Amino acid sequence: MSNIDNNRLTPAKQIHCGIEDKFSYHITADCISCGACTKACPVNAISKGENQYMVNAETCIDCGTCSAVCPKGAAVRVPFIRQSIDIKELDEEHLYFNPGCAMSLYKPELPSIIMGILKDRFESIQLHSVCCRHDPKIPHGSTIINNCAGCDRRFRSLYEGINTVSLWEVVDSLSDLELPDHTGLTVSVHDSCGYRHKPQVHQAIRSLLAKMNIKVVESKFSGTESVCCGDNFYGYVPNADVEKRIRMRAVQLPSDNVVVYCIGCVRAMVFAGKTPLYLPDLILDKKTEMMQDTLDEYHLKLGQYIDEH
């Protein structure tokens, strides 16, 4: 089965409002108790059971690192997917685009440019700039089009009556959208771990890349098997360990050019010596900025922006 195929994945259980919609990994009977997963886990979510290692689902941050280090493939993600609202069901009178705090920091002009594209199709869509960690203050039944995987997860689960769909599913559905021609460009794709359980997002992104004549060389850990770039380790382990994990992830990607759709991943790939290509930049035929912020600088700026929005 392809890592971006959803034909054999099971829809996840209904979301419980107020509880962040997180998934986890588990250890199968193939475990040989080597302990590699426990050493790599940034949050100490894995412990030795009676016959094999076990994952505490409440502690697990769903980064996927255990799956990348397990020599037997015994550490696996839960086999569930989370559906998006059908684009055909979008109510334009209650439709919003949230660019996410990180995009707004990275290139403040991008949200308005993307809004222009969306307004050509959805005339009544509104820009929504409230951080996903705060009450969105929009009507029950509204839908937020999200760029950020974390925003998608939090908006759909922490707040009553909010539907979500990724920007990439929506943009891919715009049949008359003119896209730049990037013929000759070969890339790997680093899929955001927050979208791991949405293969429809992975499919939309590959479709957009194909429309731009970009060749994709997939890595073993992509799509529903993608693992965190390492940035989510920040705050759990020393920065040196975060940077080690970032380098580990970069090595897994066959191409030096890496398509990403998360700003934290842009910074991570720059640090690891890859050339990140931020998907909004590709679609708009713009150059991706090679972010030089340290881990602390990036997270300080992001934290301040979150507090203010």
What are these model-predicted stretches?
Residues 11-33, 44-62, 75, 82-85, ...:
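Ferredoxin-like iron-sulfur electron-transfer modules
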Residues 28, 38, 57, 67, ...:
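Short glycine-/small-residue-rich flexible loop motifs, especially phosphate/cofactor-binding loops
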Residues 3-12, 22-25, 77-309:
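Iron-sulfur cluster-binding electron-transfer modules in prokaryotic oxidoreductases
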